[in-house]
């Protein structure tokens, strides 16, 4: 089999066989097929697309490129959750302890932030001493004993995706539906959970800009999950504005803790209830959505979810005092308000622009090697359709110095659009695909 023949076949619109796809993935993972040939094939896929069968075969070849976790030694139903990424997305920090209180174990491999989106592992490192790197044995033990674990991906879990994603990132081939589907689902299938719930975001701060794109992605992923015998559900949710109010690592942790204390709600709580009810019903821990939502809300009211989160932080070496005293989390020395330039209603917030403000403050990575400042970021005081008077604060900037704070004030002000008419708030949860 020749790589040049496979490239030419896809270039001309042909359908690759499972054997041809396996040849490419196996050879590339072992270092026998060079970057330049895989780059050519990736670009051909971007232009010509892939059939549903090709996408499935690509996903499975990537799964087979490394280890597949066997979670059978952990008791009960095991679930996993994935978000396609957005601004202010601290959902896992709230959702996992809420679900774990109901006896459904959550085994989650997470990543770090890059660009305008934040990473769950970075947020968790706001807790002094927290360890993201667990051995496989330690990961399994914690899921069994604590009910959930969040750790960095093991070195040999889906190595094909690591190589392919790095190559796509530098060759202009990230935006391709079959490549996105296979990247996400190969990782989820290799992670071994019985139930997979996907949060597919759409809008200005999301990877999928339109609801139609998000719907297509969701359907493809759900089908691949089901073909592998996994109970798979996708929720299409709004990312035309940041999720919650806080953007930035320690600030988002503090907001998640406020939710677990029962002191914060809004779109973040609605998302946790939506995703959580899907997990509980698919896992057989609730008879339907109403019962599931009631159980999840009770986990907050009783304090069980907060206590579960403290157990989790303690188990991974973090200082659990910070769970009950968020003032101990990293604090930025400089805070500046962003005044509204006029009176009216918030007509639009550039979610990606908000994420970039946090990144430029030092709260995110421009490159994978960038160091981040866990304390910096921003807290929004006005969101879509909220009323505001001229001079009132739209947001508070949390910065390491006056210069970066003043620059962020100007950048964040530009992300807001204020008009005389109150716009309609679009539905936050657009659809649930099973």
Model-inferred region functions:
Residues 1-88, 101, 308-315, 319, ...:
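Acidic, glycine/proline-rich low-complexity segments that act as flexible tails and inter-domain linkers
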Residues 3-5, 120, 161-169, 202:
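Gly-rich Lys/Arg/Thr-decorated short loops/hinges at beta-loop-alpha junctions or inter-strand turns
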Residues 5, 10, 15-17, 28, ...:
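Well-ordered secondary-structure scaffolds
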Residues 47, 93-106, 187-192, 227-228, ...:
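Alpha-helix C-terminal capping segments
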Residues 77-116:
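Glycine/serine-rich anion-binding loops at beta->alpha junctions
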Residues 109, 143, 151-154, 184, ...:
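Short beta-strand segments
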Residues 123-149, 219-225, 229:
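A glycine-rich helix N-cap at a beta->alpha junction
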Residues 144-193:
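Phosphate/diphosphate-binding glycine-rich loops and adjacent basic-rich segments that engage nucleotide
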């Amino acid at each position: 089999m020749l790589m040049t023949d496979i490239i030419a076949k896809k270039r001309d619109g042909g359908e690759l066989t499972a054997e041809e796809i396996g040849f490419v993935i196996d050879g590339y993972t072992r270092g026998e097929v060079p970057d330049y040939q895989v780059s050519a094939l990736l670009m051909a896929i971007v232009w010509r697309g892939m059939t549903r069968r090709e996408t499935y075969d690509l996903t499975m070849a990537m799964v087979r490129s490394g280890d597949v976790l066997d979670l059978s030694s952990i008791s009960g139903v095991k679930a996993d959750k994935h978000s396609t990424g957005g601004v202010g997305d601290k959902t896992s920090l709230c959702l996992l302890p809420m679900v774990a209180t109901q006896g459904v174990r959550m085994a989650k491999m997470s990543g770090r932030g890059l660009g305008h989106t934040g990473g769950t592992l970075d947020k968790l490192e706001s807790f002094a001493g927290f360890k993201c790197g667990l051995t496989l044995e330690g990961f399994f033990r914690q899921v069994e004993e604590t009910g959930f674990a969040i750790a960095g991906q093991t070195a040999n879990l889906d190595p094909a995706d690591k190589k392919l994603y790095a190559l796509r990132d530098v060759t202009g081939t990230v935006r391709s539906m079959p490549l996105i589907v296979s990247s996400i689902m190969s990782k989820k299938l290799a992670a071994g959970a019985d139930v997979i719930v996907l949060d597919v975001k759409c809008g200005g701060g999301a990877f999928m800009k339109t609801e139609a794109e998000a719907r297509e992605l969701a359907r493809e992923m759900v089908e691949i999950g089901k073909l592998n015998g996994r109970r798979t559900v996708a929720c299409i949710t709004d990312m035309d504005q940041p999720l919650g109010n806080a953007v930035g690592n320690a600030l988002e942790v503090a907001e998640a803790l406020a939710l677990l204390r029962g002191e914060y709600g809004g779109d973040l709580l609605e998302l946790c209830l939506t995703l959580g009810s899907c997990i509980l019903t698919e896992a057989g821990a609730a008879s339907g959505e109403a019962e599931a939502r009631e159980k999840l809300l009770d986990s907050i009211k009783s304090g069980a979810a907060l206590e579960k989160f403290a157990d989790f932080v303690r188990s991974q070496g973090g200082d659990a005092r910070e769970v009950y005293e968020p003032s101990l989390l990293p604090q930025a020395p400089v805070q500046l308000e962003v005044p509204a330039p006029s009176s009216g209603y918030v007509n639009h917030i550039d979610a990606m622009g908000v994420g970039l403000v946090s990144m430029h403050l030092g709260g995110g990575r421009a490159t994978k090697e960038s160091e981040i400042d866990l304390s910096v970021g921003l807290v929004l005081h006005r969101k879509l359709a909220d009323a505001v008077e001229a001079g009132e604060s739209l947001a508070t900037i949390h910065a390491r110095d006056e210069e970066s704070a003043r620059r962020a004030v100007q950048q964040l002000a530009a992300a807001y659009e204020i008009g005389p008419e109150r716009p309609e708030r679009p539905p936050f949860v657009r659809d649930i695909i099973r």
